[in-house]
Swiss-Prot record:
Domains: entry comment: Domain I (which is divided into 2 non-contiguous regions Ia and Ib) is required for binding to cells, but not for ADPRT activity. A subtilisin-digested fragment starting about residue 417 and extending to the C-terminus has full ADPRT activity.
Disulfide cross-links: C290-C312
Protein name: Exotoxin A
Domain of life: Bacteria
Active site: E578
Keywords recorded for this protein, A-Z: Disulfide bond, Glycosyltransferase, NAD, Nucleotidyltransferase, Signal, Toxin, Transferase, Virulence
Signal peptide: 1-25
Enzyme Commission designation: 2.4.2.36
Role summary: An NAD-dependent ADP-ribosyltransferase (ADPRT). Catalyzes the transfer of the ADP ribosyl moiety of oxidized NAD (NAD(+)) onto eukaryotic elongation factor 2 (eEF-2) thus arresting protein synthesis. Has an LD(50) of 65 ng/ml against the human lung epithelial cell line C38.
Region ranges (Domain Ib): 390-429
């Protein structure tokens, strides 16, 4: 084949041409799709071997949208390899270490490293988006295989930004290169099997944000067969892309992609994203606060007319950027918000942004503060400045697992843990949204249907949560996220109450806006996996009692704060019961709207008992909570 100037620089930079002439490299071409569809052995003694990876150009030029899945199995026995895929990506295998390097800027490549668990065969996979308004990056991941050719370990899913030219090349006619890398073998070879490319396609839709909403999460595996089965098993969840890929068609385009049985326990699926221009904390916060795809904020160009992005995403991203630019510590968030609201005209652009939407600002800044605090705590040498631009590792966590830990090399990244959310259980009907007029398109019938589905999936109702409108939207659609709290350890967590009247008092704005208005909020229903109920405890002490902290630690078996446990006690002496969930437990909850309305004419008033629908009251019984320790102290939480 002919080496074009487009990819000569990459090949040279990798050392792929070292020790061999330009012409000899051109003579060592092979046909990956045909020769290696079943199995092939490449002789690497003379330097570079190369193969075009052509696909039907009509696929990339279609008016639809889709994903190309390239894959091949590299057999064990040769651990010293260098591979390249055009100018886009290089892969170096050196013993147990696989290094990835690539990106849109040759002088500033993104680098990732993965340590294999064994020296057996492994499968190289990369996903290329195609079609209308596609994302601007590819995904790369490794599947390790055991002696029985079963999937035994999976790397994180790595994101590498690409320019339009490179993406187009990868989708049509990329070139694959391979050579031995510092091999001690006299006759180095490489065995490849099951090389192939498949595609999933669907007709274009006008709302790009929905089509690509899972591109930056572990759920991207749900797009393709057989990766959807891998996702379902590892995450112990169900691939559910709603109607975003309705009518999608999957087919093999060339070669013979492998399908592997699984020999792996349900485990975390991790997805690592690098933000070339920094700003990852601001992007992660906007993603969480506004329930917008994280992939959105890695793009250089955004679709026009995206209301949620313009009304929430951009303002939140700008707000966090302003806070960072002011060089304020994240433990000052509450005071900064109070000062901005108490003194109109103060605080510059940051103060103005807070006053424009105070509750959205409170939600966003407390989320960002919690992420920064967790980042600083999780790695030696991490600091608040590093949190602003660290990589993001999105973790899809098995529901029934214990602590959801990131990969060993993720201590320098912002970690986002993802569990099922209320959005998956809302059923058919109009879009759900929260306003002072009530929860739009939500009915008692939809509530009952959601409740039944949750029970079938192993969830149990544990109480109500009252909050302001922006938080309700974020919690139902994006899940509960830890927020910073300027409180003693015993009070830190997510608050719920079995009595809706108690939660009702919190269903309002926390602060008045610039005109002194406080809006009514929303009541939500909180469900936890039934398997987590042994971690629920009850005490007769008020949590304000001096001896309460010691009593709670005795019950939960580890020092405060709460983690995968909860404590229920009276809000005051002789008062109603409230429950605090530890943030790691709260992240596992599924939260859906209640059908109990809040009254915009009586904000801060008492709940009218007659407003509670009989059918909702009938499904709101609480489980029993333990009042004595039911398990030994957790060593990992001491």
């Amino acid at each position: 084949m002919h080496l074009t100037p487009h990819w000569i620089p990459l090949v040279a930079s990798l050392g792929l041409l070292a020790g061999g002439s330009f012409a000899s490299a051109a003579e060592e071409a092979f046909d990956l799709w045909n020769e290696c569809a079943k199995a092939c052995v490449l002789d690497l003694k003379d330097g570079v071997r190369s193969s075009r990876m052509s696909v039907d150009p009509a696929i990339a030029d279609t008016n639809g949208q889709g994903v190309l899945h390239y894959s091949m199995v590299l057999e064990g026995g040769n651990d010293a390899l260098k591979l390249a895929i055009d100018n886009a990506l290089s892969i170096t295998s050196d013993g147990l270490t696989i290094r990835l390097e690539g990106g849109v800027e040759p002088n500033k490549p993104v680098r990732y490293s993965y340590t294999r668990q064994a020296r057996g065969s492994w499968s190289l996979n990369w996903l290329v988006p195609i079609g209308h308004e596609k994302p601007s990056n590819i995904k790369v991941f490794i599947h390790e295989l055991n002696a029985g050719n079963q999937l035994s370990h999976m790397s994180p899913i790595y994101t590498i930004e690409m320019g339009d030219e490179l993406l187009a090349k990868l989708a049509r006619d990329a070139t694959f290169f391979v050579r031995a890398h510092e091999s001690n073998e006299m006759q180095p070879t490489l065995a490849i099997s099951h090389a192939g490319v498949s595609v999933v396609m669907a007709q274009a839709q006008p709302r790009r944000e929905k089509r690509w909403s899972e591109w930056a999460s572990g759920k991207v595996l749900c797009l393709l067969d057989p990766l959807d089965g891998v996702y379902n098993y590892l995450a112990q969840q169900r691939c559910n892309l709603d109607d975003t890929w309705e009518g999608k068609i999957y087919r093999v385009l060339a070669g013979n992609p492998a399908k592997h049985d699984l020999d792996i326990k349900p485990t975390v699926i991790s997805h690592r994203l690098h933000f070339p221009e920094g700003g990852s904390l601001a992007a992660l916060t906007a993603h969480q606060a506004c329930h917008l795809p994280l992939e959105t904020f890695t793009r250089h160009r955004q679709p026009r007319g995206w209301e949620q992005l313009e009304q929430c995403g951009y303002p939140v991203q700008r707000l966090v950027a302003l806070y960072l630019a002011a060089r304020l510590s994240w433990n000052q968030v509450d005071q900064v918000i109070r000062n901005a609201l108490a003194s109109p005209g103060s605080g510059g652009d940051l103060g103005e942004a807070i006053r424009e939407q105070p509750e959205q600002a409170r939600l966003a800044l407390t989320l960002a503060a919690a992420e920064s605090e967790r980042f600083v705590r999780q790695g030696t040498g991490n600091d608040e400045a590093g949190a602003a631009s660290a990589d993001v590792v999105s973790l899809t966590c098995p529901v029934a697992a214990g602590e959801c830990a990131g990969p060993a090399d993720s201590g320098d990244a912002l970690l986002e843990r993802n569990y099922p959310t209320g959005a998956e259980f809302l059923g058919d009907g109009g879009d759900i949204s929260f306003s002072t007029r009530g929860t739009q398109n939500w009915t008692v019938e939809r509530l009952l249907q959601a409740h039944r589905q949750l029970e079938e999936r192993g969830y149990v109702f544990v109480g109500y949560h009252g909050t302001f409108l922006e938080a309700a939207q974020s919690i139902v659609f994006g899940g509960v996220r830890a927020r910073s709290q300027d409180l003693d350890a015993i009070w830190r967590g997510f608050y719920i109450a079995g009595d809706p009247a108690l939660a009702y008092g919190y269903a309002q704005d926390q602060e008045p806006d610039a005109r002194g208005r406080i809006r009514n909020g929303a009541l939500l229903r909180v469900y936890v996996p039934r398997s987590s109920l042994p971690g629920f405890y009850r005490t007769g002490l008020t949590l304000a009692a001096p001896e309460a902290a010691g009593e709670v630690e005795r019950l939960i078996g580890h020092p405060l704060p709460l983690r995968l446990d909860a404590i229920t006690g009276p809000e005051e002496e002789g008062g109603r019961l409230e429950t605090i969930l530890g943030w790691p437990l709260a992240e596992r909850t599924v939260v859906i709207p209640s059908a109990i309305p809040t009254d915009p004419r009586n904000v801060g008033g008492d709940l009218d008992p007659s407003s509670i629908p009989d059918k909702e009251q009938a499904i709101s019984a609480l489980p029993d909570y333990a009042s004595q320790p039911g398990k030994p102290p957790r060593e990992d939480l001491k």
